[in-house]
Amino acid sequence: MDNLSDTLKKLKITAVDRTDDSLEGCLDCLLQALTQNNMETSEKIQGSGILQVFASLLIPQSSCTAKVANVIAEIAKNEFMRIPCVDAGLISPLVQLLNSKDQEVLLQTGRALGNICYDSHEGRSAVDQAGGAQIVVDHLRSLCSKTDPASEKLLTVFCGMLMNYSNEKNDSLQAQLINMGVIPTLVKLLGIHCQKAALTEMCLVAFGNLAELESSKEQFASTNIAEELVKLFKKQIEHDKREMVFEVLAPLAENDAIKLQLVESGLVECLLEIVQQKVDSDKEEDIAELKTASDLMVLLLLGDESMQKLFEGGKGNVFQRVLSWIPSNNHQLQLAGALAIANFARNDGNCIHMVDNGIVEKLMDLLDRHVEDGNVTVQHAALSCLRNLAIPVVNKAKMLSAGVTEAVLKFLKSEMPPVQFKLLGTLRMLIDAQAEAAEQLGKNVKLVERLVEWCEAKDHAGVMGESNRLLSALIRHSKSKDVIKTIVQSGGIKHLVTMATSEHVIMQNEALVALALIAALELGTAEKDLESAQLVQILHRLLADERSAPEIKYNSMVLICALMGSESLHKEVQDLAFLDVVSKLRSHENKSVAQQASLTEQRLAVES
């Protein structure tokens, strides 16, 4: 290392004299020392103050320029040397050298800039300010189609530099590269050089960095990236290499156009093959790959076009294979199968076909296996399927007679909000316009008590909202006195009154219709609860508020008329001077509201 100190002193003097021969000797010594012990040599270089000297040596006409760039590339392998390289003013002269015609200068300069950018925000910012990215993108464009070894070497270095440059938490550098049109160039490069492992890997990492950005998706969609990635994926045997392709596929597959391209390029068949190969393995990496493949499969089904293409009228091979995952003993496959079915069940035609072909029984069997200490994600996914399947009118009766309500009610004791939410949604869909089922459920005291409890789940707005909506639905669809009595006895009335003040018009309306039925069918039973929940005051507010939707005003007036049958509520109506508010509504632009206002006004006048 004494030798190194001499070299550094000599280099300082030589740098001033610019005698290329002795300069070259000094640089060779440095490179040798860096090969033997990079870290220690780099520390010495930093301590010697020679970095500033390097800036003056990075000149296009010198025969030593490539070696200087090589020394910088080597020292920048150390994290602690990157900011000193920036501070020494090396970036600007290095970026200037990117315009050189000398292959070796370009190669070493690309390495130096790439290493300085690695994991260094300061390095990337300096390259950005010096305009380095655009020059590198232009080089990639012109070299892209060349397959000679020297060009491929350069391509690998420049690709590596862009990979490090784009690996920034701040999106602005990635957005800048996208605007420079780097994506089509990299996709073309991947297609031409797919046999070259190092180049391919760098392309993939750069894609991964760019694919997270929404603005990149359109550019990717206009290339043949799907075809190239699937081609590459099929070739990979090693787990790590496949993982790299997966990391690009997942963010890209969030875009519907790319989903369809991936499906058309045969990705689904590859994924199904992986599932088949890995399903019985207990190796950690195989389990991880099975999860990635099945998750990606579900993601592809989130696009309407890609989903329909794979459904093929329920006859498709993919649909059949996914169906076979549900009875599997592998939790990950059960989950992916249920999520996939939930995605297929996004249109009525598919839902009707699946119910007619026995999907409900398969899902109920799956749920049955997860009742006691079951897998929450599987429960949630299976309930999501049943909820979607229950949307078409023709499916409701079939699902009810298949025993879906009984299967779903087994999860009433669940303490997991996602499961509670889907359970409520499924029941609400099932009883829509099904009077008998609504009555049966509405008289189920355990269910109604649980609903009332969940109506107070303030930490889980979704569960709270769905509980309220199901309470209202039980009344609206059953129109049953017994159901109303059960809800009154369980303390549900106050929640329906609160629901009438919801910020969602649909929920307000459902509450008002249910309350009108209560007032028409069981006013005596509910009277005290309606009073203590301050229903009359709330109705006055809804009618007086100009922001209330027409249907809210209409149903509020219908409800006021229905409440007149109760002495105490009637008195509250009189005390609040409803006539003033209602008479103003006679000139409302909505005809139904205006008409109902006239009727309500007459009723109020007669009863006063």
Curated annotation (Swiss-Prot):
<dbReference type="InterPro" id="IPR000225">
    <property type="entry name" value="Armadillo"/>
</dbReference>
<comment type="function">
    <text>Acts as a GEF (guanine nucleotide exchange factor) for the Rho family of small GTP-binding proteins (G proteins) that stimulates the dissociation of GDP to enable subsequent binding of GTP. Additionally, appears to chaperone the processing and/or trafficking of small GTPases containing a C-terminal polybasic region independently of GEF activity. Targets include RAP1A/RAP1B, RHOA, RHOB, RHOC, RAC1 and KRAS. Regulates mitochondrial dynamics by controlling RHOT function to promote mitochondrial fission during high calcium conditions.</text>
</comment>
<feature type="repeat" description="ARM 4">
    <location>
        <begin position="392"/>
        <end position="432"/>
    </location>
</feature>
<keyword id="KW-0677">Repeat</keyword>
<feature type="modified residue" description="N6-acetyllysine">
    <location>
        <position position="231"/>
    </location>
</feature>
<dbReference type="Pfam" id="PF00514">
    <property type="entry name" value="Arm"/>
</dbReference>
<feature type="repeat" description="ARM 3">
    <location>
        <begin position="348"/>
        <end position="391"/>
    </location>
</feature>
<keyword id="KW-0496">Mitochondrion</keyword>
<dbReference type="GO" id="GO:0005783">
    <property type="term" value="C:endoplasmic reticulum"/>
</dbReference>
<dbReference type="GO" id="GO:0034504">
    <property type="term" value="P:protein localization to nucleus"/>
</dbReference>
<feature type="repeat" description="ARM 2">
    <location>
        <begin position="171"/>
        <end position="212"/>
    </location>
</feature>
<dbReference type="GO" id="GO:0005634">
    <property type="term" value="C:nucleus"/>
</dbReference>
<dbReference type="InterPro" id="IPR016024">
    <property type="entry name" value="ARM-type_fold"/>
</dbReference>
<keyword id="KW-0256">Endoplasmic reticulum</keyword>
<dbReference type="GO" id="GO:0005829">
    <property type="term" value="C:cytosol"/>
</dbReference>
<keyword id="KW-0963">Cytoplasm</keyword>
<feature type="region of interest" description="Prevents binding to prenylated RHOA">
    <location>
        <begin position="122"/>
        <end position="171"/>
    </location>
</feature>
<dbReference type="GO" id="GO:0005085">
    <property type="term" value="F:guanyl-nucleotide exchange factor activity"/>
</dbReference>
<keyword id="KW-0007">Acetylation</keyword>
<keyword id="KW-0344">Guanine-nucleotide releasing factor</keyword>
<comment type="subunit">
    <text>Interacts with RABL3. Interacts with RHOT1.</text>
</comment>
<dbReference type="InterPro" id="IPR011989">
    <property type="entry name" value="ARM-like"/>
</dbReference>
<keyword id="KW-0539">Nucleus</keyword>
<feature type="repeat" description="ARM 5">
    <location>
        <begin position="480"/>
        <end position="520"/>
    </location>
</feature>
<dbReference type="GO" id="GO:0080120">
    <property type="term" value="P:CAAX-box protein maturation"/>
</dbReference>
<feature type="repeat" description="ARM 1">
    <location>
        <begin position="89"/>
        <end position="131"/>
    </location>
</feature>
<protein>
    <recommendedName>
        <fullName>Rap1 GTPase-GDP dissociation stimulator 1</fullName>
    </recommendedName>
</protein>
<dbReference type="GO" id="GO:0005739">
    <property type="term" value="C:mitochondrion"/>
</dbReference>
<dbReference type="InterPro" id="IPR040144">
    <property type="entry name" value="RAP1GDS1"/>
</dbReference>
